[in-house]
A protein has these predicted regions:
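Walker A/P-loop nucleotide-binding motif
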Residues: 189-209
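Interdomain "pre-motor" coupling segment immediately N-terminal to P-loop NTPase/helicase cores
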Residues: 96-158, 166
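Nucleotide-binding/hydrolysis machinery
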Residues: 162, 292-295, 310-320, 328-435
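Short helix/loop segment immediately N-terminal to the Walker
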Residues: 181-193, 223-229, 269, 311, ...
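Pre-Walker A (pre-P-loop) alpha-helix and adjacent loop at the N terminus of AAA/AAA+ ATPase modules
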Residues: 151-194
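Conserved AAA+ P-loop NTPase core
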Residues: 207-319, 330-347, 360-362
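Bacterial C-terminal helix-turn-helix
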Residues: 1-85, 99, 105, 411, ...
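Conserved RecA-like P-loop NTPase ATPase core
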Residues: 171, 198, 204, 239, ...
Length: 488
């Protein structure tokens, strides 16, 4: 029997669906394609547009099929892929909102695996239309990943300025690559080899971006148990590396064996041991990691293996590394405080976070949108009166460039809700010669040991301009230098 062709009347819709099926949802191209499919401007937030899109695709599928069956294998090669995309597109949109409900149920039940019985129906639909059972089960997992990626990127990262749209597109590509066809054929089970570095100012949202990535990894579907293999929340483990002393840092990362050091009374599984297959480890403040730990992390990234502190056993690491740093990491590279080989291995992808001032300069209404979102986050309600009051106070801050970014904005809202005013932090007046003041306090004997060390560290840093020099002169590690400087 000769292979079929797509009838001319359906060629255009099949071409558009094929182009839109796995298109980055944060790329304007997708909205343009969806708009053409429904014959009007498509709005993601309008359910009537969603239903119109689903109906248009379903109508084409039914018309092209036979008694509800549309086997893509019966079409000639040039058309078979388009029919395959039409089937996948329709199946995904059938369980679109069901997956959103499942995500929200799973968020309320951390550590538990919530059943998703609709996956079986999706598998049956795909199998009837030419897909193998193995393929069909895999696609349920991909649909779930796509839905979580959109859910968490769009909800964790509020904003519609051009720079935020570009940032969200980069995050999406970091999960599925710029071509999801490559992801499907050869990369979906190798993404752990592609680490990512998020670079942004304090308070710009690195943690939110990392959790959006971490919650959006692939999770296989179990057809027998009618549930996904694990809770996506269990696949993301995180640590702020700046909170650990140098002596404890490696233990927290790699774990330790009983007796490895004073106080190691039992074996301890570190961060990497707690990361499961398809999971992610988030290393915040990676720029603060001492050189000795950088060498061990480099080995982990290159060889996918490590050893616990005090142990000889070699353990495998099966997850993905998401790291975050301030823009000062570039200076650390120049100063020799951050290894270049480690940096290159860490940066399969480097994504810059936009600052709040950049976002507002591109789209002034973004400030109001952020205020509305943060008020709801803080109070649990969307109150126009509260928003109006907060915006009125913020309007008095002419020229304020929000150095603390979203975190500062959130705290300003808290202060306004409490006192109806906000006073931004200002850098203290440096008119007094700090060196003379420090010397006077030494002469008067008015400094504590901590103040003496902090003042001296600050003086050395002002002279040399980097942590490494201060560390060598004071004969302390870089982490201690940072602690002194934070106190000064």
């Amino acid at each position: 029997m000769p292979l079929k062709k797509i009838p001319h009347a359906f060629k255009e819709i099949c071409d558009r669906v094929a182009a839109a099926t796995f298109c980055n949802p944060f790329d304007p191209t997708r909205r343009e394609l969806y708009s053409k499919l429904i014959g009007r401007q498509y709005d993601d937030s309008d359910k009537s547009d969603f239903h119109a899109l689903s109906e248009a695709v379903e109508k084409a599928r039914v018309s092209l099929g036979n008694a509800g069956i549309l086997d893509y294998r019966k079409f000639r090669a040039i058309d078979a892929e388009k029919i395959r995309m039409l089937i996948l597109f329709g199946c995904y949109h059938q369980i679109f909102y069901l997956m959103d409900e499942h995500i929200e149920s799973q968020l309320k039940s951390p550590g538990k695996t919530i059943p998703f019985r609709h996956g079986g129906g999706c598998v049956s639909t795909l199998c009837r239309n030419g897909f193998s059972e193995e393929e069909s089960v895999w696609y349920v997992g991909v649909f779930y990943q796509i839905r979580r990626a959109y859910y968490f990127i769009s909800r964790n990262l509020i904003g519609s300025s051009p720079c935020m749209h570009a940032f969200k597109r980069r995050l999406w590509n970091n999960l599925f690559t710029h071509d999801i066809g490559n992801y499907e054929t050869c990369m979906w089970d190798r993404m752990e080899e592609f680490s990512v570095l998020l670079v942004g100012e304090t308070g710009s949202g690195k943690g939110s971006a990392a959790s959006a990535l971490g919650y959006s990894g692939f999770v296989p579907y179990d057809l027998v148990k009618k549930c996904f293999a694990f809770d996506f929340q269990d696949a993301f483990v995180a640590a702020n590396l700046s909170q650990y002393s140098q002596s404890l840092l490696e233990s927290e990362l790699f774990g330790h064996r009983k007796g490895a050091f004073t106080g190691a009374l039992s074996d301890y599984d570190g961060l990497f041991a707690r990361c499961r297959a398809f999971g992610s480890v988030f290393l915040d403040e990676i720029g603060d990691v001492p050189l000795t730990a950088q060498i061990k992390l480099l080995r982990l990234l290159q060889e996918r293996e490590y050893s616990p502190v005090g142990g000889r056993q070699i353990l495998g690491f099966c997850g993905r590394v998401i790291a975050a740093a301030n823009p000062s990491i570039d200076q650390h590279l120049n100063d020799g405080e951050f290894r270049h080989d480690f940096y290159y291995r860490l940066c399969s992808d480097r994504i810059e976070l936009p600052t709040l001032r950049q976002r507002i300069s591109e789209l002034p209404s973004e400030l109001e949108a952020m205020v509305q979102y943060l008020i709801r986050k803080i109070t649990g309600i969307s109150d126009q009166g509260l928003k109006g009051m907060v915006m009125e106070v913020l309007s008095t801050l002419k020229g304020h460039d929000w150095p603390g970014n979203v975190r500062e904005l959130e705290q300003s809202i808290r202060q306004i809700l409490m006192s109806q005013h906000y006073t931004p932090w200002k850098e203290p007046d440096d008119s007094i010669d700090k060196v003379d003041e420090f010397a006077r306090k030494i002469k008067n004997g008015s400094l504590t040991a901590s103040e003496l060390a902090s003042g001296y560290a600050r003086h050395l840093y002002d002279l040399n301009g980097n942590y490494e020099s201060v560390s060598k002169i004071m004969n302390v590690d870089r982490r201690t230098v940072k602690k002194y400087l934070n106190r000064s």
